[in-house]
Amino acid sequence: MRAPPLLLLLAACAPPSGAAVDPTPPGWEPAPDAPWCPYKVLSEGPETGGGRLCFRSPVRGFRCQTPGCETLASAGGSLRAHVLRNRSVLLQWRLAPAEARRVRVFALNCSWRGTYTRFPCDRVLLGASCRDYLLPDVHDSVRYRLCLQQLPLRAEVAVVPPELAECVEFTAEPAAMQEIVVAMTAVGGSICVMLVVICLLVAYITENLMHPTFRRPSLRRQP
């Protein structure tokens, strides 16, 4: 089993006061008795095989804090992507009860835009009980496109056509570059403070040691 510790940490941390938060709308929060989510990652390439079956727990109480998180929605509104500053993306989706009974599996297709064409990335198959998925380690400044499609039950394939995929596009911000800029700004400020202290110290030494003050001769007559 692989449980995402990052999401558990995000769910447990409350947002600070004064920070804008995108609340979880009704219908997006998983049920208290929601089962484990089975999923399988199908990597690209002929030697990757069919993937390994894994399980993850649903995310509860997630809040998208605007300084470090951005929420994007698909055209149909049933798929949401929360782009976090740590280069991970949390996907959430919801279905009507009638639609949920017809779903056999969800297919999550991923691609990213290159200079002249689009390149596919890992494909994920998720069980019918899944309502969220964490996509870790996305690349900075790359335009991603994620599409979630509902695959119906085998008995209803000929009766009910597959639903059109809900897609969302996003670009992860270069968080590492922002951290470097912040660090360089902090270091530059420290250097400026040190230079000011050194200048004051040199001025003090020059004034008091290089040019010592002489006492004036006393005007009192000696007996």
Curated annotation (Swiss-Prot):
Descriptive protein name: Fibronectin type III domain-containing protein 10
Q: GO terms for CC?
A: membrane
Which InterPro entries did the record assign?
Fndc10 (IPR034446)
Here the disulfide bonds are none
User: What residue ranges lie in the Cytoplasmic compartment?
Assistant: 201-223
All copies of the Fibronectin type-III domain together span 72-168
Compartments annotated for it: namely: Membrane
Q: Kindly indicate whether the keyword Transmembrane belongs to this entry.
A: yes
**Is Membrane given among the entry's keywords?**
yes
This protein's membrane topology, according to the annotation, is: Single-pass type I membrane protein
Signal sequence extent: 1-19
- Per the UniProt entry, what species is this protein from, by scientific name? Mus musculus
Membrane-crossing segments per the record: 180-200
The record's keywords, sorted A to Z, are: Glycoprotein, Membrane, Signal, Transmembrane, Transmembrane helix
Gene name, Swiss-Prot/TrEMBL: Fndc10
Q: Which regions face the Extracellular side of the membrane?
A: 20-179
Using the UniProt annotation, give the residues that carry a glycan (glycosylation sites).
86, 109
Q: Which domain of life is it from?
A: Eukaryota
| One Pfam family cited in the UniProt record for this chain | Fndc10
